[in-house]
Amino acid sequence: MSIRPLHDRVIVKRKEVESKSAGGIVLTGSAAGKSTRGEVVAVGKGRVLENGNVQPLDVKVGDIVIFNDGYGVKAEKIDNEEVLIMSESDILAIVEA
């Protein structure tokens, strides 16, 4: 996949997260709801500050992140794969191993 986000934008590939119902049944796909976790596949150069300097992003390619899946997050198909384009501010946390 070849895509380069601009400024503070981040490209994230959603990760399927397995979840269980209250009765212990494993839910996958649409029954589990959309995951708000994903892997960062591309990052922009950073946020341009008022003084013209560029503040680098905290996230990097390969990070697993938890994000706010709401207004401002745009889904796109690139090479038949769905990816999400979002600002770094839409990312709530980086999952550390």
Swiss-Prot record:
GO biological process: chaperone cofactor-dependent protein refolding
InterPro entries the record matches: Chaperonin_GroES, Chaperonin_GroES_sf, Chaprnonin_Cpn10_CS, GroES-like_sf
GO molecular function: ATP binding; metal ion binding; protein folding chaperone; protein-folding chaperone binding; unfolded protein binding
Subcellular location field: Cytoplasm
Domain of life: Bacteria
Keywords: Chaperone, Cytoplasm
SMART domains: Cpn10
Signal peptide start-end: none
Gene Ontology cellular component terms for the protein in this record: cytoplasm
Family note: Belongs to the GroES chaperonin family.
Assembly information from the UniProt record: Heptamer of 7 subunits arranged in a ring. Interacts with the chaperonin GroEL.
HAMAP family tied to this protein: CH10
Free-text function comment from the UniProt entry: Together with the chaperonin GroEL, plays an essential role in assisting protein folding. The GroEL-GroES system forms a nano-cage that allows encapsulation of the non-native substrate proteins and provides a physical environment optimized to promote and accelerate protein folding. GroES binds to the apical surface of the GroEL ring, thereby capping the opening of the GroEL channel.
Matching NCBIfam families: PRK00364.1-1 (NF001526), PRK00364.1-2 (NF001527), PRK00364.2-2 (NF001531)
Protein name: Co-chaperonin GroES
Organism: Serratia proteamaculans (strain 568)
